[in-house]
Amino acid sequence: MSTTTQNIPWYRHLNRAQWRAFSAAWLGYLLDGFDFVLIALVLTEVQGEFGLTTVQAASLISAAFISRWFGGLMLGAMGDRYGRRLAMVTSIVLFSAGTLACGFAPGYITMFIARLVIGMGMAGEYGSSATYVIESWPKHLRNKASGFLISGFSVGAVVAAQVYSLVVPVWGWRALFFIGILPIIFALWLRKNIPEAEDWKEKHAGKAPVRTMVDILYRGEHRIANIVMTLAAATALWFCFAGNLQNAAIVAVLGLLCAAIFISFMVQSAGKRWPTGVMLMVVVLFAFLYSWPIQALLPTYLKTDLAYNPHTVANVLFFSGFGAAVGCCVGGFLGDWLGTRKAYVCSLLASQLLIIPVFAIGGANVWVLGLLLFFQQMLGQGIAGILPKLIGGYFDTDQRAAGLGFTYNVGALGGALAPIIGALIAQRLDLGTALASLSFSLTFVVILLIGLDMPSRVQRWLRPEALRTHDAIDGKPFSGAVPFGSAKNDLVKTKS
């Protein structure tokens, strides 16, 4: 950018169409967050009515993560083939329908299936909205685009907590899910009133449809084997998370089977760049493992361990959700200033100073707890707002929605494991200690994976001929693309 351009405030680099595109996607993601967290808010009520164990109740949160990988793949491919806008609308309709079904669920199995539908829609909304906004904004503002967008999910969680405190004590937990049908109206408006993403239009102008991940996996020469593997993965995940298996060894075997299937899909669809794709799934897996025990079980901790009433729970969750939302926006500024990976690492390191105090002070002072949660979530959870930008930079435009959707949502199975692991550890320790221990230890794994740019590093080790040296979204160098000790200018020389 020129000196004159740099002196212009960042928001003046955006035209009205770009702001409208962002606003529409942000509202869609807010509604996604609202619908998704409803189950966490009423988990104790649902557990009591259906007579569920703690692990079974936690599996209702996990259910939405089980189907996310498939939703991210299918709806991401839709976004790559037919445009980001159609994929966004379809995703909103899916998660809204699943939420309504939760309100009518007569028992555990029905609600579990409804949560599977929500997971598919949520996955599609994440991938399509993220690529839509990132590709609509200028390159030097794309960390902000990512961070601002993902803040909508946290705002949706805050709104849901406030609605919970007003609705559930009067009309019961089912009424909360009936409200979740409203996003369908918004989806109909989206279909007619927002433009297509600029990068996607430029890539596809006058060209034949791209060959998507769905084409490669389910219409190629290995389609029969891939369909069988898809069914096998779905069945294995069902048995792992539906509370039907008590044998840890069997669960481990099924988990390894799923991992092998997902790696196979990545090898087939990404070609020589499969090491990058696999490592991105690992990054996201640990990102969910460190953050989602708190996201999923914080309401339960507040209601059981701290004995807070619904109104106080809503107030504390407001601080938590608002902190995450602010953190997404702050992360966007940090990412454009420091660079995506450096901003991620610095924010997570700062969050580590707060995670132990959050669960050590108890519930005597609600305001102190709320403030600690605000800053911890701002630094620890909010920085995940730039994760779509980080992941998307490893994929070209014609594979970005499916690549982001699949890698992110396979890794998001960590979110399915997280509440169950937290609940299991809480059987031996108190819930607060379990949540703090998981988050504190696993955050360091994410710091290492992102700080060392392990996707690029492993790609260089295994398939260097397909190494990408620069971010496909903003053109900045990948630090892991050169060996330790190499000159920094090497990356500039190799930029295509």
Swiss-Prot record:
It comes from the Bacteria. The keyword Transport applies. The chain crosses the membrane at residues 22-42, 58-78, 92-112, 148-168, 170-190, 224-244, 247-267, 278-298, 313-333, 355-375, 406-426, 431-451. CDD domains: MFS_SV2_like. Residues 1-21, 79-91, 169, 245-246, 299-312, 376-405, 452-496 are cytoplasmic. GO terms for molecular function: carboxylic acid transmembrane transporter activity; sialic acid:proton symporter activity. GO terms for cellular component: plasma membrane. Keywords: Cell inner membrane, Cell membrane, Membrane, Sugar transport, Transmembrane, Transmembrane helix, Transport. Residues 43-57, 113-147, 191-223, 268-277, 334-354, 427-430 are periplasmic. GO terms for biological process: carboxylic acid transport; sialic acid transport. Pfam families: MFS_1. Belongs to the major facilitator superfamily. Sialate:H(+) symporter (SHS) (TC 2.A.1.12) family. NCBIfam families: 2A0112 (TIGR00891), PRK03893.1 (NF003024). This is Sialic acid transporter NanT. The gene is nanT.
